[in-house]
């Protein structure tokens, strides 16, 4: 695993092709192969199995009361209890933070589980570190998106498997749209006017999309307790999304460049919240705020 810093973001799309493909399934398969027990739902790896009790899993003494077999290594579980809330956050924010816990019957064995977990996550492209905070809390946080979850769309939209004729005709399914009749041919001038209108609409849509990406990125960082590496990774992904917006419009190009620069500032190690960014841009009381923020 390598981290690229101070890179011209025009080349991010190329470099991202050489990074490991992230998929939670790969992480937990390897954990299982190393002898670590998993109390996770294998359809998503983002919630515990139906028969697992979080209150028992997160406490060593409580767990050992119910688990009679000797623990060879240890076990892993998640603190997430609402899979649909997690899916919704991914749909709205393009990603989400999920917390996993780990334990064993001794501190040394628990540390081995944690180190193995971090190592495998890093190998599969997830940004996290083995720190004293992780060791003390026995909690590992990672940023995920829909590509990390097996069968994400299937899990989130089970109603797609149960459509009836009434659903189809009443257009209850949001993925099904009625096809309008083909319009009559129009004059050349009318077509030109329509093209200009479409160009303006397209411009506004792209400007709105860029604004939405910037606002959601800053809000997401403010809302979640992320490490500096995770902030850098998340901002980099959003910059890749911005760079993928294809346009020849000069206004859109300028706005895209400005938005990318803003997100580059957010991902700087010294900028930890949206207020940091605002003060940095305004050059007002920046140093004092940074001392408090850090």
UniProtKB/Swiss-Prot annotation:
Pfam families: BAG
Region annotated Disordered, chain positions: 181-204
Single GO term (MF): protein-folding chaperone binding
Biased composition (Basic and acidic residues): 190-204
Transmembrane segments annotated in the record for this chain: none
UniProt record similarity statement: Belongs to the IIV-6 391R family.
Name this protein carries in UniProt: Uncharacterized protein 391R
Lineage: Viruses, Varidnaviria, Bamfordvirae, Nucleocytoviricota, Megaviricetes
């Amino acid at each position: 695993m390598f981290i690229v810093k101070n890179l011209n973001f025009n080349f991010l799309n190329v470099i991202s092709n050489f990074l490991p493909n992230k998929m939670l399934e790969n992480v937990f398969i390897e954990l299982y192969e190393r002898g670590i027990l998993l109390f996770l739902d294998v359809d998503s790896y983002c919630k515990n199995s139906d028969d697992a009790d979080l209150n028992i899993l997160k406490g060593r003494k409580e767990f050992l009361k119910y688990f009679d077999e000797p623990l060879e290594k240890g076990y892993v579980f998640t603190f997430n209890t609402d899979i649909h809330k997690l899916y919704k956050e991914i749909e709205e924010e393009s990603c989400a933070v999920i917390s996993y816990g780990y334990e064993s019957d001794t501190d040394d064995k628990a540390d081995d589980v944690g180190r193995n977990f971090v190592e495998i996550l890093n190998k599969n492209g997830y940004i996290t570190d083995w720190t004293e905070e992780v060791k003390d809390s026995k909690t590992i946080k990672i940023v995920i998106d829909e590509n990390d979850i097996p069968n994400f769309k299937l899990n989130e939209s089970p109603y797609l498997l149960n459509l009836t004729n009434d659903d189809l005709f009443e257009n209850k399914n949001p993925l099904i749209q009625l096809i309008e009749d083909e319009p009559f041919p129009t004059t050349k001038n009318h077509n030109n006017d329509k093209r200009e209108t479409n160009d303006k609409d397209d411009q506004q849509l792209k400007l709105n999309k860029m604004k939405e990406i910037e606002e959601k990125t800053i809000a997401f960082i403010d809302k979640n307790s992320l490490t500096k590496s995770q902030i850098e990774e998340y901002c980099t992904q959003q910059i890749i999304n911005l760079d993928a917006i294809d346009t020849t419009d000069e206004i859109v190009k300028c706005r895209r460049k400005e938005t990318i620069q803003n997100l580059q500032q957010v991902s700087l190690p010294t900028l930890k919240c949206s207020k940091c960014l605002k003060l940095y841009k305004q050059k007002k009381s920046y140093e004092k705020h940074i001392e408090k923020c850090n």
